[in-house]
Amino acid sequence: MKNNFFKKTIILLIFLSIFILYSNADEETITTPPGYYGLKRIKRFPHSNIESNNISQTDADLYYPDICAGALPNAEGDLMTFYTFLDANLTLNKFLITKESIYSFMVHSLVILPGGSVTIKRGLLFFSLEEYNSLNIINPAKFPLDPMGYFPGILALGGSLTLIGNYPLIYSAQVLSKTTLRISPPFSSIPGDNINKLYQIKIFSDSNPLGSLCSIIMDSTRTIVNISGCPPIGNEKVMKVAFIKFTIDEMNTGISNRYSVKKIDESIGASIFITGDTKVHIENFFINGDGRTLNEEYNDHKLIFSPNNKNIVTDIIKGSNQRYRNSLYIEFSNNAVIKNCVIFEKDPRRSPIVFFASNVEFTSNIISSYSGSNLIAQFGTENIRSKNNHYFLVPYSRSLNTSAKSMDYGYEGGNGLYSLSPNIKSENDTFIGQLNIFNFNFISNRSSVTSFDRDCYAPCYNDSDSVLSSVQRPVDFYLINPKYFKISNITLFNSTIFNLFVANSNGNQPNTYTINGLVAIGPIVANLDSNFLILKDFIATENFKLDGSVKRLDIINSSIELPLTSKDIIKNVSSLSTNIQNSYLYYPSNDSVEQLKDQIYGSVITPYYYSSPITLDRIKIVSIYPNSPLQVISGLTFNIVIQFRLIYAFQDIIICIFTSDNDSIQNRTVDFNVLSNKCILPVSVGPNKEGSANVRVQIKNSLSSDYLYIIDFPQITVLKTYTFYSGWSMANPDLANQQFIVNGSLFQSGCQTKTDSNCTISENSNYVPNLPNVTSSDELNSLFSSGVTSLNSNEPVIITTAINSNSTISQIQLFFTHVPIDQHASLLSVYIDNQPVYVLEPLQSNQGPTFKNITFKYENTNSLEKINIAFTTRGDIYLTSMAIYSSNIFFIPPIIPDPTAIPDVPANENTLNLLTIVLPICSAVVVASSVMLGRLFYKKKFKKFKSADIENEMTTIEPIETSNSNIENKSESIATPQQRNEQKEIPNKIHPVLKSLVKPKIAPYTLISPLPPLETKTPEALNPHFNEIGCDPINENPEINSDEQIVLPVDTPQISPDSPQHSIPSSSPPPPPLPLPPSTSLKPLKLPIVDSFRTSSFMFRLERSNLIELSDPNNPLRFSSKILDFNLKGLKATLFKEYSNFLLISNISSSTIFVKVILPRDSRTGNVGYNVHEYF
């Protein structure tokens, strides 16, 4: 009977094995117990420079059955059991066996060895040899079994596999009635009237994510389809249909396990296993494989080798749940394309698709499964581009414990894309039924998981770069426009849990994770305790919220389109630092917006609150200033500026209402200037003011009570000035007596590991000499020539240093040199007594080594004599030196000029005031480097100069400079030797005893940006002077960053954040300037300076100089030339030849002007020459 059954059904069974005719020298033959195929052992990972570490449970070697050696001969009669193809290339296109009908091409195993090439344009059905053996009806010999469990299925070990169907499978559908659909594009692939007889459609929707198989009647247009034999169509929110053959035969374009020999309608598991850098192209195929990897804990087959011979297997233990036996599994493939396919898995499984260390293009597919995940990227080096796919999922969960060594991931039950990889890109994908759309898991020291100590990110070739498995590069998530729909069938899905994005870090080193361009349609969970999360170009819509734990959170260039304040956004996120910049937050005008004042100093939370969605269409914010925490010296002036564009023509005046919580900055209403598109608030800080101010501006229609925008500026701190106390250089610790004198201030070398030193350093420090120059000053380069970093990446280097116990407030200044080791940013964190000052600040330079200066305040309320300073980096940022400033050491008052030396002046003027103007002068010989001009006038006349200067809106340098002081008083924080001798309160010896440390109140200050590289021979690069805090030594007007639409001073570094649990003190000391080269020997001027100007932004700054153009109507002088080039016209000067030039200066005012010309140093005497001209 059984024999008659097979004769009637005329089933053709063909065993395929494709291999090339040369042997592989790397293969080893393994002997197995009777009843099994022998095995071949090959290197699993084709990269020649990456070797196994032999510590992982994941095999670095791959074993596959030697089926060609054990193939049985064909039996006589109607049934062919096996064919072994010896050709290197094979195309399976059409199989027609004519007896009673046309039947399918059935396969047990298809093997492609390296070099082989297989193209299949028709469908394949798989059957089980174990079931066939149990029948034992035709051939008495039993077929050997696969000891590794690859079959039934396809095993590709190299070469290429091409599965391409002849017509598209997937169509969009519009519901016309409960039984009628309109499909697009028209189904025109099959001619004639056989469509209704030969085809069915499978409808995938949010009510039936596993699909309904329906019979069809199609009209003549091939667009209208009437369905029957399936549930009626409901109110579907999303629907896709796939055309499949009514019976699986040779015309079907698919791979299926639909038939088995034992029972015609019983499914068996089949899988496609791709490895060995096989080139894969699968298009227009229906993959109904029901892979064999369950959503349970892995339990692999195990080979028991002989203790005396590694090439003999004595026993095989079959596992109950082998990994990597999914419907489609691709590993170590540099070129894999899956397009317009339907991948269906109806039984509970781990995932229908797993990509492992491969480069995959995954486009326009339908994935429907009852599984833990739709797709898993499970090695960590995958590069996957998912676009326009529909992921249907009925979550199937198991409570398992993640095991890193077994790489047992993706079973959680409800993941769309589950990944261990940083390079997963999703664009316009649609998800139906998931609990977590994107679930990323980053594990530390992946070598214990992958079997390899080094990684090579796909695509990976023999000559590709490899990196240590313990290194996690910065991660950029590109998750563009995802769409999500819940399952409407309550019997299939009854969970209220839904997360758009989940990221976990399992002990990784500090790293940066950036989510780019995401439209947030649901919650985001970030469990990245030691990491930096950036939301960039981010749009938050309905159901958005943010949960988890990060070390630093930045929201940049984003829009929150639901009523949330900054506090609402971050209330469920634990973070040390939060920054919200150039981002729009919707908040109704009838509700009050709470200003966040309890954040750390380094947090920049400056959202643009808008009252109504229509506001975005009427006003566009361009920039604000300040856009980072600003420090100003008391007694100075500066401007607060907001720039915006009016898109809508308002009938009434637009006003800006500035308010402050500190009387240092007065409340004021300012009209919007339609010419400059700005509201400018001039601020003049009193001479005795000190403290921090939080400033807010409301943009309003003058006749309306509702606001249009509310914007909070970064904190503005008014400072007083302290002076230099002590300095240390991280020079050779063996030269403890080595000293550096910079601008008269003494830096002592030799931080020791000894405990009795005034400067001790932890033993994990790595001393590095001969660091590259990062400034144009020889003295500073000498100070910065050596540095320390950690021996182990991101392990803190701790320095214990003495501090003035008699000073309540001190300042600490740290100088770092960054020498990049690759193109990726390095993260710098700084702590004082275990409290964060600077958190994960990214430093990156594409132009070589750069300089970083950090200054922060320390409140020594317990009169400590020593403090601990710690910093962490990945090993390419070096601390070169540090300085401490004390609040109870004051500047020496400037020398009062002798009034008898002042020349005679007209009777109506009893004071001679000096106005300084600087001109750029070009020459290759010693020439005049600046011209200083003075003029006489009454204070009331001088006011017009001050008001004109205030209108220079974005000037941040000049506001920090004082008036009515002598030019010799540079307000520097590093004292001269004379000043140090006169400062009697500095102790001669600092007590070495370390008292119990307390948690201080701290506030960091961002100082200057990295200096230009030395090879850049611009006037800026040749300037040896550093600017003060928040100042730009070259450009006076801040530059608008077009990418972020934020006004930034040119080259200003980003703000570094700090711990949120520490309040900011009400007062702060000044940020001391960097040490400068020794000052010139200029004699004190005998006239007080009223104000000073320079006439070019390319000219280096003289003290307290403002920028004024030569053509400015407020400029009382006219010059015959702007540049003195001594007629050289760019040529080099001849040695020992004298050159001359002249400058004609005309006074067009009624006041008397005093002119002083300052010349560069004399090369012989070392003195600075100057020449005094008469009044004119």
Swiss-Prot record:
Residue intervals on the Cytoplasmic side: 935-1176
Chain positions covered by the region annotation Disordered: 965-985, 1050-1080
Compartments where found: Membrane
Single GO cellular component term: membrane
Membrane topology: Single-pass type I membrane protein
Coiled coil (residue ranges): none
Family classification: Belongs to the GDT family.
Protein name, as recorded: Growth-differentiation transition protein 5
Organism listed in the record: Dictyostelium discoideum
High-level lineage: Eukaryota, Amoebozoa, Evosea, Eumycetozoa, Dictyostelia
Gene that this sequence comes from: gdt5
